């Protein structure tokens, strides 16, 4: 995405207002329920570690094995830790060359124990057919893969205009994989609804994306209201692939929060 950008997981809790960190502990006001939340984002096909210079010294950095080690350490403390991802899990190394045929990135998120992820702009780099093939490959692998959520795809507008071939491919793949506006997950004694949002900046940075999207903030509000009406949950979380800027007035994730 453009400029310096970070994708954040927005934790929306009625009883609690707190800044979000890479590792978050949430607790109800009465102290009755506790939840640990970990999240990743923009892993960009970096399944393997690589050698680079850090503070003048050559070091081996990155890689899913290191992330897995950290997650496993946290899960030893709390097996019911919620693990979320903010999208852009693909495109960035040679691993992307098997994006459509192996779905290596999404399957590896499953290996990490990721519960829920969403789409980033780079998931659309191989066009509609590439994303559709990747989703079907991941589903057909038979492995445990993360749930995928995005609440602001404007299917009504696209269907009114008549779905293109690419849009039909993605619609079919969404159905096969089970992509939803939101999902409900139980972690120990805590029930969490997780929704996904694809931001305006993400769309501007995805020229090969054929989908149309509704306003992310309004869609998130509407989905939260739907969750409150239909689901009995302790907490609502949103994984958003948007942008943050110094000016809070135009910073998408901060506006969404």
Label every PLM stretch briefly.
Residues 1, 25-26, 190:
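Short, intrinsically disordered, low-complexity terminal segments
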Residues 18-31:
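Sec-dependent signal peptide cleavage junction
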Residues 29-257:
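Acidic, metal/ion-coordinating pockets
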Residues 11-19:
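Bacterial N-terminal signal peptides
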Residues 1-11:
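Bacterial N-terminal signal peptides that target proteins for export
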